[in-house]
Amino acid sequence: MLFIYLIVTFFTKMDSVSRIKAFFIMLLTLADQPLTYKIKISQCNDMIINVPYNECFPIYDDCVFGSVLIFQKSDSSKYQVNLYPNINCDENGIIPSKIPYNESGLKITDPLAFYLMFLIIITILLIMIL
């Protein structure tokens, strides 16, 4: 997305207002993408998967079969990750039976730092362009 933005702004005759509009359109397009988290499953040789937030995500692997659900705890800003072995997501994308399983082996990486770094880089590039 950034590459396309740079090509459009460099190779077309755009004034600074149009460049800023294109920049915000690019940010809105990125914001519309589903938020995913990287999950490391230590029971599965530290397998890393990308899981969408608050959706049931099926896992089909040699060492793990089941579903993962990430949700934010209501009492804090921390996220909770539940692994449900041998349970499939239903057609609505939820887990039919809520039986938490061994959360200690799951680690979550918050993508907020990635988005913050991305916005800093975009801002620096925008300042350099304008």
UniProtKB/Swiss-Prot annotation:
Transmembrane segments: 110-130
Top-level lineage group: Eukaryota
Annotated Gene Ontology cellular component terms: membrane
Keywords: Glycoprotein, Membrane, Transmembrane, Transmembrane helix
Topology in the lipid bilayer: Single-pass membrane protein
Residues bearing carbohydrate: 102
Places the protein is found: Membrane
Record's protein name: Putative uncharacterized protein DDB_G0268382
Taxonomy of the source species: Eukaryota, Amoebozoa, Evosea, Eumycetozoa, Dictyostelia
